[in-house]
Amino acid sequence: MNTIMAATGFLTGYIVPFILVLSLLVFVHEMGHYLVGRWCGIRSTAFSIGFGPELIGFTDKRGTRWKLSAIPLGGYVKFFGDEDAASKSDSSGLSHMSLEERAQTLSGAKLWKRAATVAAGPIANFILAILIFAVLFGIYGRMIADPVVAEVRENSAAATAGVKPGDRLVAIDGEKVMTFEDVRRYVGIRPGTPITVTVERAGEELKLPMVPTRTETTDQFGNKLEMGIIGIVTDQTSGNFRHIEYSPSEAVAEGVRETGHVITGTFNYIGNLVTGRMNADQLGGPVRVAQASGQMATLGISAVIQLAAVLSVSIGLLNLMPVPVLDGGHLVFYAIEAIRGRPLGAGAQEVAFRIGMMMILGLMVFATWNDISSLIG
C-alpha cells in the first residue's frame, strides 16, 4: 500500500506538472513553426505534441493532422515533402511532385521563407518567456535591495580585495548594477572567473579585482547547487529592502531584461561546464526537470509559471544549437546555402543528421545518468 501511495504521489506531484509545463512550451514552439510556415505558403501534414504512436487526434480542413502522441518529451511539425519529423527532405517523393506542389514544401520554398519558418520556433519560446515574466512583474512587482554592503565575510574574495561595510557596488566588469540581486546574479554564474568590482566609498570610486569562490549550496528542497560567491551581505538598514510595482510597459521591459538575464546565465553556465569551473554533474535532464516542476508546484502556481518561463528560454536556446536535427542545424545549412549559392549535397546532409542525432542521444544519456545519480547519491 505504501508503495502504491508513493508511486501515486510521485505521479501527481512530479510527472503531471512536468508534462503540463513541457507540453505548453512544446506547443508554443511548434506553433511558431506552423504559423510562420503557413504564412510562407508551406503546407503542414502533422502537428504533434509528443513522439511515437498517436493517442488522439483529428485532421483539419487543410489536411494537417493534429495529435497527442505517447511519449511526452517533445513534439514536431511535419511539413509537406518531409521524410520525417526532423524536416529532412524526402528526395524520392519530391521528384514526383509538380512545380506547384514543390513550392508548398519546406525544401522547395525560398531560402528566407525556410529560415523564417525554422527560426520561428525558438523565437516563439523567447516571446512566451517575455510575456510570462511581464505578467508576473505586472501582478506581483518585485522586492529589491540596494547593492550596499552591510558585512564582509572573513577570508572571502571581497575581504581579500578590500571591500568594506558601507561600500556601494556600482558596477562589475564595467556593467552597472542597480540592486543587490544584480550582484548575486552576476557573481553566481562566474565561479573562479576573475572580475573587477567598482565600489563607491566616501564619494570616490574604487576598482577592486577579485575571483568569486566556487561553493556548493543546498536549496530549500535539498538540491545541491554550485555557484560563485564573493562574501558580502546586506541587510534592511544598508540595503533598504522595498517592494516596487511596474506599469504594463515597465513590466514588459522587465520581462525583456529578465529573459536576457536567463539567456546570459545559460551561456555562462555552459561555458563553466566546458571550462571545468562547474562540475559536469550539474547538467540535468528530464528527470531533474520533472523533479524541479514538482518542487515548484508545492510553492504555488506563480512558481510553476516562473519555471515555465525559464524552461521556455532553455528550449529556445537548445533548439538554436548548431547541431543537425535541431533548428540551429537547419539554420547553419541555410547559411551555407546562402554563401555557396546552392545547398549541401544530400549525402553530406545525411552524414550531418546522423552525427547530430548521436550527439543529442549522447547528451540525453549523460544528463539522464546525472539525474539518476543525484537521486540515488
Swiss-Prot record:
Its main location: membrane. InterPro entries: PDZ (IPR001478), PDZ_6 (IPR041489), PDZ_sf (IPR036034), Pept_M50_Zn (IPR004387), Peptidase_M50 (IPR008915). It is a multi-pass membrane protein. The chain crosses the membrane at residues 118-140, 299-321, 351-373. NCBIfam families: RIP metalloprotease RseP. GO terms for cellular component: plasma membrane. It is found in: Cell inner membrane. Belongs to the peptidase M50B family. It comes from the Bacteria. The keyword Transcription regulation does not apply. Residues 129-202 form the PDZ domain. Zn(2+) binds at residues 29, 33. One of its GO terms (biological process) is proteolysis. Pfam families: PDZ_6 (PF17820), Peptidase_M50 (PF02163). The active site is at residue 30. Its EC number is 3.4.24.-. The keyword Cell wall biogenesis/degradation does not apply. This is Putative zinc metalloprotease Atu1380. GO terms for molecular function: metal ion binding; metalloendopeptidase activity. Keywords: Cell inner membrane, Cell membrane, Hydrolase, Membrane, Metal-binding, Metalloprotease, Protease, Transmembrane, Transmembrane helix, Zinc. Its cofactor is Zn(2+).
